[in-house]
């Protein structure tokens, strides 16, 4: 069934209430989606995009009810991905000579999917126009990497409608087409989820591209997206949101997510959260177990947050697989203006937290100190977790928090004595396999090696707490080997 968008513009797309996975299984479409295609009927008849390939036959059948396919003058493909151009093969079987207007990159993508280089392609660039009669034109604007190299937008003069492709859309299915007809809270949530999980890597391109489009000084009375609602009520509100989200966005929010084998890392997460809210009751704190939570919800919360704490148990001396996968996704999303800290519980070997810290730093996060607990955290260990949360709350505060009472400090002469004593303990030693460092001043209490024990007095049965290898793999720490 078609819907009148405005004047001679019809929506001829397809709702998909059942879809729950997008881009393979990488994006959960919990509210379904729609594949928006538009038919413009002026002196020339124009089709803007098609629908997902799984609805190809239905799409062509429905389009026949609106127009004799032979009367279709032009096809515009804003984006060659299969959820936009998937029905092209079915359609072109009926009208093989119809001109297709798209970017040069789109021709490569379309041929890669459909394998019909003989189709009647016409390459367009930013500023190119196509006269469709009745005093109206289509103006094309290339938008490479928002979010594919082939992407573009199309503007219809006279009606002042911007066919925006993936930008400003959302995976959101509703029987109503327009933004003022649907639940506003749901709509906003799905818009932000869409931006956070799909467009965040390209945030640096969003602002200049929007500025370029606004520079045309064209009125925009509607924004017709490729997924979700058409923006007709205050359509530029979503443009303003994109500019906000693209500008190193953060809220006063901290996200904690973790995976755990024996519930120990969960206990740490809860205690850290308690410490944060104890010091800063105003900050929003959300905790997710990655094994039981929607991945895209977690990533959306990370996008919204000023910082993230990531927890993992140690398995085979590395982090849990679901944590590793999610951190890899965060690396690809290239979040900006975020801080991070790693934490986790381990048994005989604890390499995961250090590995996780390195991965988070590689992903572009500004790192704070990490936190480890051996085995199941006891009362003292949980207090350390709460203190870690208190420290994080102060370090990550967007504005200064009330200063806590100062802790009692040792007398200066005591500090001097302690420093002198530390100097007599000999060098720190580093494991040549996993780079764990033995500090004589700290010892290794978990193996009954007390603080203040020089390396020469460490028992021969000592094992590296990270990789479980013996003393023979340790060397003097490079910074001290002079």
Curated annotation (Swiss-Prot):
Query: Which positions does UniProt annotate for FMN binding?
Result: 260-264, 342-369
What's in the GO CC field?
cytoplasm
Kindly state what the record says about how the cofactor is bound.
Answer: Binds 3 Fe cations per monomer.
What positions does the entry give for Fe cation 1 binding?
79, 81, 147, 166
Which GO terms label this protein's molecular function in UniProt? electron transfer activity; FMN binding; iron ion binding; nitric oxide reductase activity
Specify the Rubredoxin-like domain's residue ranges: 426-477
Cofactor names: Fe cation; FMN
Instruction: Provide the family line.
Output: In the N-terminal section; belongs to the zinc metallo-hydrolase group 3 family.
Q: Which PANTHER family match?
A: ANAEROBIC NITRIC OXIDE REDUCTASE FLAVORUBREDOXIN
Specify the protein name: Anaerobic nitric oxide reductase flavorubredoxin
Species name for this entry?
Klebsiella pneumoniae subsp. pneumoniae (strain ATCC 700721 / MGH 78578)
Q: What gene, per UniProt, encodes this protein?
A: norV
């Amino acid at each position: 069934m078609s819907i009148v968008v405005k004047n001679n513009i019809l929506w001829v797309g397809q709702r998909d209430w059942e879809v729950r996975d997008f881009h393979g299984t990488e994006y959960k479409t919990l509210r379904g989606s729609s594949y928006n295609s538009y038919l413009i009927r002026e002196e020339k008849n124009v089709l803007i995009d098609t629908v997902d390939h799984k609805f190809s036959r239905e799409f062509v059948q429905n389009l026949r009810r609106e127009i004799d396919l032979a009367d279709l003058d032009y096809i515009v493909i804003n984006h060659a991905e299969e959820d936009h151009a998937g029905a092209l093969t079915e359609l072109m079987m009926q009208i093989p000579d119809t001109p297709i207007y798209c970017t040069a990159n789109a021709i490569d993508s379309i041929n890669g999917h459909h394998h019909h280089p003989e189709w009647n392609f016409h390459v367009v660039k930013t500023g190119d126009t196509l006269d469709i009669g009745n005093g109206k034109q289509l103006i094309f604007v290339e938008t490479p990497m928002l979010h594919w190299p082939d992407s573009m937008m199309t503007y219809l003069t006279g009606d002042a409608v911007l066919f925006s492709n993936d930008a400003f859309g959302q995976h959101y299915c509703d029987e109503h087409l327009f933004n003022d007809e649907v639940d506003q809270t749901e709509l906003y949530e799905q818009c932000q989820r869409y931006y956070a999980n799909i467009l965040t890597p390209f945030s640096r391109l969003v602002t200049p591209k929007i500025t370029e489009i606004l520079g045309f000084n064209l009125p925009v009375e509607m924004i017709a997206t490729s997924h979700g609602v058409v923006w007709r009520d205050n359509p530029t509100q979503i443009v303003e949101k994109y500019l906000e989200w693209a500008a190193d966005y953060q809220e006063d929010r901290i996200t904690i997510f973790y995976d755990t084998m024996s519930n120990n890392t969960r206990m740490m997460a809860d205690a850290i959260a308690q410490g944060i809210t104890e010091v800063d009751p105003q900050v929003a704190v959300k905790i997710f177990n990655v094994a039981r939570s929607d991945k895209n919800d977690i990533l959306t919360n990370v996008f919204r947050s000023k910082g993230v704490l990531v927890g993992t148990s140690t398995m085979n001396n590395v982090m849990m697989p679901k944590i590793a996968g999610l951190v890899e996704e965060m690396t690809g999303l290239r979040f900006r203006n975020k801080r991070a800290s790693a934490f986790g519980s381990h048994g005989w070997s604890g390499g995961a937290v250090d590995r996780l810290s390195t991965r988070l730093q590689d992903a572009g996060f500004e790192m704070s100190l990490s936190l480890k607990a051996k085995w199941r955290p006891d009362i003292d260990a949980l207090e350390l977790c709460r203190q870690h949360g208190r420290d994080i709350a102060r370090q990550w505060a967007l504005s200064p928090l009330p200063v806590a009472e100062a802790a009692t400090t040792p007398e200066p002469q005591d500090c001097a004595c302690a420093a002198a004593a530390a100097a007599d303990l000999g060098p720190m030693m580093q494991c040549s396999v996993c780079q764990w460092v033995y500090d004589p001043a700290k010892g290794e209490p978990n193996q009954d090696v007390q603080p203040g024990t020089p390396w020469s007095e460490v028992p021969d049965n000592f094992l590296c707490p990270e990789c479980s290898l013996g003393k023979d793999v340790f060397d003097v720490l490079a910074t001290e080997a002079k």
